């Protein structure tokens, strides 16, 4: 496990070692966080909320 900081509440988040950029992790504060690559290291950011697609 990799120990990262939640960008929302600042608490620790355990992320599996084999996590890939783009994976979504839900934290106990209720935030949905996206794993991303920051200078070769895993980091977390708030995941984008996908809206409804009304296109046909």
From Swiss-Prot:
Knockout mutant characteristics: Cells lacking this gene require arginine and lysine for growth.
5-glutamyl N2-ornithine sites (modified residues): 56
Motif stretch (EDWGE): 50
Annotated Pfam families: Zn_ribbon_LysW (PF21344)
This protein's record includes keyword Iron-sulfur: no
Processing after translation: Formation of an isopeptide bond between the gamma-carboxyl group of the C-terminal glutamate and the amino group of alpha-aminoadipate (AAA) is catalyzed by LysX. The bound AAA is then converted to L-lysine in a series of reactions catalyzed by LysZ, LysY and LysJ. Release of the product L-lysine is catalyzed by LysK. Formation of an isopeptide bond between the gamma-carboxyl group of the C-terminal glutamate and the amino group of L-glutamate is catalyzed by ArgX. The bound substrate is then sequentially converted to ornithine which is eventually converted to L-arginine.
Disulfide bond annotation, renumbered to this chain: none
Residue numbers carrying 5-glutamyl N2-lysine: 56
Keyword Zinc: yes
UniProt GO molecular function: zinc ion binding
Complex formation: Monomer.
Protein name per its UniProtKB record: Alpha-aminoadipate/glutamate carrier protein LysW
Gene behind the chain: lysW
